[in-house]
């Protein structure tokens, strides 16, 4: 079955087909479009649904980190005739436990974050996935209209590891650049684009100088202020 054919069948599934909600057709089409030209040896997502069916036809191997939560959503995907056999590995359970415990054996060409949406769970998933995302691969972040996830979206837009290539409905698509992997075991907050300028929360002159003045000029200004 070719991708365009299966995509049409997936899009035609009713909106309530998946017990935990479904991606809009525009998002599914964007996934298929951005996957073109990529050698998808291994992809991964948190959450399951129509995207899982689509990835089973796009990738040689696909990892699904999800749990039913009593609504039968994972089983519905597993039993769908649109799921390509032998491609998808289901790692069931809370992603707060399953993602950190998983031993990734190869780079990932696409990662989609659509698991639990409460803070800090998206951020936890990102932390454990980003070192494994291959250069040129895709990071897909769903539900960026949720404030805490929108904060992640704003962070990623300024990070040198990622380039925003599309927002479809409330789903953001980032391409992994060739920038080095940010050390997941270090600090280096000052190296990250989102953190280049501190927020002003203390309005005394010295604090304003630290927040706004470039580091090379800061010492001289603080000296003039008598600090």
Regions found by a protein language model. Give the residues of each.
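S-adenosylmethionine/decaboxylated-SAM
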Residues: 29-226
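C-terminal end-of-chain micro-motif
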Residues: 1, 226-227
